[in-house]
């Protein structure tokens, strides 16, 4: 099936009519929900300031020169850099020294101060812990006491979420290519709804981890599939900005997380509000039809015709007959077995050397973008006292970045955009390195700028990847790239260890990687203003002067015979049929030797055995009819056809 013919559907029914607008808003709303569930884990795994709980009611608490009647008030003033213990006097007169993970009883009850040389007795935190409640009145860490010797359980939350994102990306992208976009969207939407509600009714650490894992797995799978879905349901004229601005809704979701975390200090109430926001989508996800691209790639023409007719009715436009519009493709698809039509394997992304190179470059771009996204995102929000504020700024800065990206993409091609944005991110990263460490606010603003540029790369690379690959593996290509990109998230916690070698080593490595990725992106095909492809066959049959999507033209030894020339020759000389290779080689191609010998000139006749085959007359015993005696022009053209046929076999 010719992808350009599929694109012609939107010329009939509209590129972004009422039907597509409704579907887009439904998909965008759920993208907002994915942003909420993605980033809510940022605050779920925060370890608040804490201290070992004393075995009684506190009468007075002292921390250096500060005293208070409540231990929680002292904890609100203490930062992670403070290592000294807190002195407390209980109602019964006992004095205890409290650290984060231990407590010490003093024998002398008359001295409440740091200078003490009497008898002490250490004991574990049998009574639990006291937490700072200025930010959160309760949280996952507090509910499950994930501190001290249980602290590694809290640190497992983020790696598990990353693994869920990776698994969701590759799993649901495969299911999308195999069973359809709509089926994958239904499964992920139900998963987001079900596990979002289930996360409200958990009372132990294991249940918490299971629900969060499947929740982010479904959210990740949804965002990958919905991006491809939007690109295939919207016409070429509105496809770029519509797909890019799905990330805008994702950023709005991140801003809502920051706002909710600032206003709601109770963890369970915070979760309820976020789940309520994401619930309405489940009521309307059944409206999503399958995309014409996927249906046609699977040979399901009746269903595709029904979808196109429905879209035409909603858009108040004229429909089109797919059998007439895609008649050549319908005939071709009948000659294919179901096995040849349905190939949805990760190995298809490496089915030849050129495709393998393209896939590896795309994966490197994804890896670099994700590395910078989380590295500088961590740099921006690392200040413990203002996490919601900086997360809000991160989301707010991404929105104008996406708008600028859409404007830029209208004027510059995909490859140049990728190169430019990666180079800008590398240069701003170097600016962040050379700035004095005393300018903390300025450095944080530069990190915010780098984060915004990398966010644009991240939004754009979804679009570019979907345009590079055909429908049969499009979602798998985006999903596998997203999975590879999150491999970089595994290295983010180790950047602090790299900083011990040299404080700027992580930023330097990212800057070098960004330059390398940008330069290699020039090797990728240009997809601006080109129709999306439907199969690998259409990917490899692009015109030679523009080169196909794999970066090369068709092989010289297998050039196609122009069927229109063959038919005109048959009509001119009254032959019963055209060249036997006319249908085989397709239209729009020239004979192998046409460029070499020129039009209307016959090449030298190949002698018997020179090519490993006898001439056509030797094998068949002649043409079976005598040529016109006085028509040399006809003889030359017949001889041209014979010699050309030898090259075809």
UniProtKB/Swiss-Prot annotation:
It is a multi-pass membrane protein. Residues 530-560, 579-649 are annotated as: Disordered. GO terms for molecular function: amine transmembrane transporter activity; carnitine transmembrane transporter activity; organic cation transmembrane transporter activity; spermidine transmembrane transporter activity. Residues 530-544 have a biased composition (Polar residues). It is found in: Cell membrane. The chain crosses the membrane at residues 19-39, 156-176, 190-210, 214-234, 244-264, 268-288, 356-376, 389-409, 417-437, 445-465, 475-495, 501-521. GO terms for biological process: carnitine transmembrane transport; carnitine transport; cell differentiation; monoatomic ion transport; organic cation transport; spermatogenesis; spermidine transmembrane transport. Belongs to the major facilitator (TC 2.A.1) superfamily. Organic cation transporter (TC 2.A.1.19) family. This is Solute carrier family 22 member 16. It comes from Mus musculus (Mouse).
């Amino acid at each position: 099936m010719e992808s350009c013919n599929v694109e012609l559907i939107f010329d009939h029914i509209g590129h972004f009519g009422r039907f597509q607008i409704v579907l887009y808003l439904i998909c965008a709303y759920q993208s907002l929900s994915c942003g909420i569930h993605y980033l809510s884990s940022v605050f779920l795994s925060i370890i608040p300031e804490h201290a070992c709980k004393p075995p009684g009611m506190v009468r007075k608490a002292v921390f250096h020169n500060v005293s208070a009647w409540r231990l929680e008030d002292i904890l609100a003033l203490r930062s992670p850099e403070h290592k000294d213990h807190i002195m407390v006097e209980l109602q019964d007169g006992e004095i205890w020294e409290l650290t984060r993970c231990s407590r010490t009883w003093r024998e002398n009850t008359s001295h409440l101060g740091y200078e003490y040389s009497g008898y002490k007795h250490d004991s574990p935190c049998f009574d639990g812990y006291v937490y700072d409640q200025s930010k959160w009145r309760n949280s996952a860490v507090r509910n499950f006491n994930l501190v001290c010797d249980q602290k590694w359980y809290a640190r497992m939350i983020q790696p598990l979420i990353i693994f869920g994102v990776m698994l969701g990306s590759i799993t649901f992208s495969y299911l999308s290519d195999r069973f359809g976009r709509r089926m994958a969207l239904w499964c992920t939407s139900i998963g987001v709804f079900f596990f979002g509600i289930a996360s409200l009714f958990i009372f132990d650490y294991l249940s918490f981890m299971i629900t969060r894992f499947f929740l982010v797995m479904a959210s990740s799978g949804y965002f990958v599939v919905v991006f491809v879905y939007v690109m295939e349901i919207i016409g070429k004229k509105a496809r770029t900005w519509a797909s890019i601005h799905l990330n805008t809704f994702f950023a709005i979701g991140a801003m809502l997380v920051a706002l909710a975390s600032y206003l709601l200090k109770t963890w369970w109430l915070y979760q309820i509000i976020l789940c309520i926001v994401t619930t309405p989508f489940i009521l309307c996800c059944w409206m999503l039809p399958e995309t014409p691209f996927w249906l046609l790639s699977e040979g399901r023409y009746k269903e595709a015709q029904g979808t196109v007719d429905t879209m035409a009715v909603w858009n108040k436009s004229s429909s089109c007959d797919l059998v007439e519009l895609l008649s050549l493709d319908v005939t071709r698809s009948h000659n294919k077995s179901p096995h040849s039509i349905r190939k949805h394997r990760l190995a298809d992304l490496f089915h030849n050397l050129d495709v393998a190179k393209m896939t590896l470059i795309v994966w490197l771009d994804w890896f670099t973008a994700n590395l910078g996204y989380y590295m500088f995102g961590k740099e921006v929000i690392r200040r413990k006292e203002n996490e919601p504020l900086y997360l809000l700024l991160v989301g707010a800065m991404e929105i104008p970045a996406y708008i600028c990206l859409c404007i830029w993409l209208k004027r510059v091609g995909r490859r140049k955009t990728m190169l430019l944005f990666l180079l800008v991110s590398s240069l701003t990263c170097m600016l962040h390195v050379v700035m004095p460490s005393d300018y903390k606010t300025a450095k944080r603003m530069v990190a915010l700028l780098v984060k915004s540029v990398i966010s644009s790369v991240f939004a754009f690379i979804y679009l570019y990847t979907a345009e590079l690959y055909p429908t049969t593996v499009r979602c798998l290509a985006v999903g596998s790239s997203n999975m590879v990109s999150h491999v970089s998230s595994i290295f983010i916690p180790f950047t602090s260890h790299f900083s011990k070698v040299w404080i700027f080593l992580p930023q330097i490595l990212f800057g070098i990687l960004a330059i390398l990725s940008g330069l290699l992106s020039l090797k990728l095909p240009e997809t601006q203003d080109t129709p999306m492809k439907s199969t690998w066959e259409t990917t490899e049959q692009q015109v030679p002067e523009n080169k196909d999507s794999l970066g090369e033209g068709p092989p010289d030894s297998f050039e196609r015979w122009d069927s229109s020339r063959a038919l005109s020759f048959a009509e001119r000389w009254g032959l019963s049929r055209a060249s036997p290779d006319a249908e085989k080689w397709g239209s729009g191609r020239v004979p192998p030797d046409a460029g070499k010998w020129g039009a209307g000139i016959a090449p030298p006749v190949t002698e018997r055995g020179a090519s490993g085959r006898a001439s056509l007359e030797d094998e068949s015993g002649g043409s079976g009819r005598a040529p016109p005696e006085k028509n040399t022009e006809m003889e030359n053209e017949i001889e041209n056809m014979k010699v050309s046929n030898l090259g075809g076999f």
